[in-house]
Amino acid sequence: MKKRMIALMLAGIMVLSVTACGGGGASSKNQNNQDDGESKQVGVEVTEDMQSAPPEDAPVGGQVVVAISPGTLSPDMYGGWSNNATNSGFIGLMSGYALADYNRDYVLDWDPVVVKDHEVIENDDGSKTYRFEINDNLKWSDGSPITAKDYVFSLLLHSSPEFAACEGDATYGWALVGYNDHVQGTTKEFAGVNLLGDYEFSMTISADQLPNYYEMANVAYGPEPLAAIAPGCDVKDDGNGAYLTDGFTEDLIRETLLDPDKGFRYKAPVVCGPYKLKSVDLTTETVELEINEEYLGTYDGTKPHIQTIISKPVADETIRDEFEKGTIDFYSAGTGEKIEAALTKVEEGKLDANYGLVPGTRINEMRYMCDFGPTQFEEVRRAIAYIVDRDEINKQLTGGYGTVVDCYATDATTDFAAIKDDIESELIHYSYDLDKAKQELIDGGWTLNEKGEEYKEGTDKYRYKEVDGELMKLKVEVACCEDDYSKLYNTVIPPEAEKIGMEYKYTSMDFALRINHLNRQGIDEPEYNIFYSSIGIPEILFYWNCFDDDPSLMGSWNVNYISDPELKAIGKEMQKVDPEDIDGFRKLYGKFQLAYNKKLPSLPMGSGVSYMFFNPKLKNFVPRAHVGWGAMVLDAYFEE
């Protein structure tokens, strides 16, 4: 099968950030007392094609301090739950040994560090079995061996009703034979997962999930530590599929996963990535990672050379000052004023930094909740789009270093770049137009006043609509934080909403509370129709999950809670494209983007480029798109 670029990400589809966070930083011992030797190259622009594995003789040591936006660190330190952009950087560095990994061209292939041998078998019933033998030298951070049981356990755990009851993402293996029966608890066996030996196992993709454009991604899972998460339990296979012995219960994993002092969700005591968790303090928002000495490296042999990584909350207003003082190693500037000011200081020799351009891969958006209230109706979503001057807002926020996007992609997205010229003229470019906004509401039935009589502009303040026999007020509730984006939105949008008969009410809250409302965790009923957020657009995305209204996908994959037959149908068509048929996939991809542009599950506000400035002593650090700071740090090393 032709190797394809795959993005094994939820969220984010599922990854959330309110504002662009600063990058990272170094302890003062790394930047202070710098010499003026020839090895210190300052003011150098690095480009993506300069990335590589660190040299074999690169020194190991030093400390990188990652600047995070104050108030954004959540308790989650382990994969399997909704985590934001701040946490995902640390979690990613503690994760490893997936069966497939990306090369530096973002092409997914089997990881030779993990996979010793594999075989693909096409079965008579139309299903397809992937059989793996893993290497026998892999270890967890505690020194215990990683075996086939740990890979099988990962699938059994993350597709179990017990894990779902712990508010975890229980969608692992969703394309495999027997997934539905296992996740619903109908059978203890997972029919499409088989334990074949100490280092051998297999996964079988269901016939109804084939062909599948991202086929390899459906079996590219990593391990979980069976002995640590489910002590006393075992993985068995009697021929009908792998299963966990009777000791595996919800109470057991609640203790091992959710205990606030030692649970995996919060403390990640055993991992297999390049780094392991040394400590975490939510009060000071300090996360400290250290090298996992048991880690064998990525597919190309890349191993960590920075000894420790530590977080430091830094306000956006002071992040460059912190960098200049030598307390942080790198930071991102995302507005024209900040970019140009920093570049000028570098050119004048007043800012000790190297730098690189990072193309925009995130969309700032107004994320609609499409399952309740006025925003469940597409006419309301479009009406809001017509009362917002997106072009002017984007210009003010980025200083000209950004673009307004009209669909679910950015200019850095390869598939979109390939079809942009074909569909751009058909995309609606929503711009300020009160008449169009009002017409959308009229077309959507928002033609009544609070008495149920005909709405009269100039007399009645707010519009209403009869929904399920009752009057629904045209009122949208917005959850936001106290950032520049929110402040500007909340200044310009509410008065325009009043002009079309809409009440637009915003509530500012801290980041953690907003995340709880967004993820609907710890709340009785959803309250907010709109969240100001940003979302990363990976090179490859499971569109068929992101817009599927299956209850198990709502919130984790389908972040808009949208139930739209057209988006769902196109997504399923995209899934069924043969991996070899790139043109066929892109044709459907364009069709999807046009539908998204009309349905507006979210209103894209813009996408901006950023410049990352970093300590010149941090060598082999290459800013680039489609990876987070963690991948850049993993390549890097300090050179005094």
List PLM regions with ranges.
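N-terminal lobe/hinge region of extracytoplasmic solute-binding protein
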Residues: 65-123, 270
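Periplasmic binding protein-like
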Residues: 66, 143, 323, 328, ...
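Gly/Pro-rich hinge or "lid" segments in bacterial periplasmic/extracellular proteins
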Residues: 103-105, 219-301, 308, 435, ...
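Aromatic- and charge-enriched surface segment that lines or borders ligand/interaction sites
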Residues: 117-170, 196, 202, 322, ...
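Surface-exposed binding/hinge segments that line
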Residues: 168-252
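Ligand-site clamp/hinge motif
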Residues: 262-266, 294-342, 503-505
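Append "and occasionally in soluble cytosolic enzymes with long acidic Gly/Pro-rich linkers
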Residues: 290, 376-494
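Detector for C-terminal structural segments
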Residues: 387-423, 485-494, 520-640
